[in-house]
Amino acid sequence: MRQEELTIHKALPADGDWKSLLFQPLPERDHYETAQGLSFSRLAGQILGTPIDETDYYNELYELSVNDRITILSETLDKTIEPETFQKLQHIHSINQKEKGLSVSRFVAFLDGEKLIAKHSNPLMHRHLRKALMTLLHTFADSHEKGLNHPDFRRVLLDVSKFSLNHLNPWLEKTDIEREMPKVVWYGDATKSQLYFLYYLMLVGCDVLLFHPAGTDQLALVDPKQELGFTEKLPDVSELQPFPKEKPDRKSTVAYRSTKEIEHVLNHEESMLYKPWQFRDHTPVSVTLKTTYDELFLITKERAFIRPNFKADKHSIEIPNVFAKIMGVSKDNKEYWNRLHTLADYQETEMVRSFPFTEEIKSNYQFHYSHALDQEGNIDPDKLMASNVWQYKQLPAGVQTAIAKTISRMCRYPRLKALHQEQVKDVQIYLFKQTTNLPANLLKLIQMFDYAQTVPKLVLYHTEMSGGLTRSDAAALLFLNEIGIDIIIYNPPGHQDIEQFIEEDQYDIHWLDDMVFQQDYKEPSLVKRLFRTITQK
């Protein structure tokens, strides 16, 4: 005979009407059945961003908060834990470490034996609570390289257990699970362990809704394929505000709403009509284009949003840029110098004709590097910006964040060639110390960078007479390329310079007709300079 079970189904709101479904009793929802156990639909998901009129958004949140059937868990979370409970959890965790990872079933058996799992008088729900916890543990183990021995697991274990005892137990005691399950709302940011508890509530069958006005997709951590819940993206985003303690009473006029709607249509990320500095708080990520020699000059004169592969979303902006080296001089000498002078004369161009153009940092940065790492061994941008080594505090907040995230990315995937007997970590530390000490002229390029608009350029004219390009120069070039700046290196004699330090697949090389030695830089004539200045305005 088949054992009776409790089965949870995913409820999907029709046309985004999650509110009607939220307050619908279980027997009126799809998949409700009591013939062979209990079967019902659970509403779970996240509402990202805000409507055009934020007042409506916060009114809706306030209305949810005053409804007795709903718990705003983000505002009422009980983080206390009894000493005895803590000791029991600590003991089970130590057993797990000694045995180098208990099986999920044994782990749940230990927790059940110590009465550390929520319980219920209905045997179907009682058994389901344990199955749901096993699913949670499997999910954690499968998404972490060290499984249940991962450093984050202890915190997740403690929090899921104490939150279950502090909240889920009392909720279930007063709930008729054949009529209604607990309804939970979370507003704003959640920690990793809090997200796993919300995930557990979904698995158990509670209705769970997450709201984030800034549009942060938090459920991707625990439900990346949206197997449990839905995601609704509202048309706008806004900064995270405190949860409304009273009903907002400011009403938008029709004209105000119309203005906001028009502004959204014109200036949202995919409109191709961008306000100045619209993306100043976005994370810039370069998409380095592979071009021909002729295409190089067509691309560099275009603004970023006109270039192929430009893309912007709520948080990041992908900037098509170029990283190219031009070897030799073309037979058409006039065209060669005209193109070079055009690049050099752009207002957003920094020209380098003397090398090295950066300073080699000799200090040992291993301590600073290790203290900027997160638990995964990658640079944490927030830790970096709060550290003593951070020298960019005078820059706008968005620029600081962009620099820190760029340093983190380039150290995670270093493209600088290792010296003899250097390990990957040595290269990462070298990149870290060089990019935390960038010269003022390069910082200026970054500060003037309005990501969707004109792309700043670094043009290097390097001959055998102008000094040697160093490893510290190469580190700076990799950083500027990573953040989205155009880099063009002229080398008339066709000598190797960046090839000694940077992996060859990171840039294009264009070979011209003749290798020319001891070729001084030719300044444009006064007439040409004046004409070019007029035509660029």
UniProtKB/Swiss-Prot annotation:
This is Uncharacterized protein YceG. It comes from the Bacteria. The gene is yceG. InterPro entries: YceG_bac.
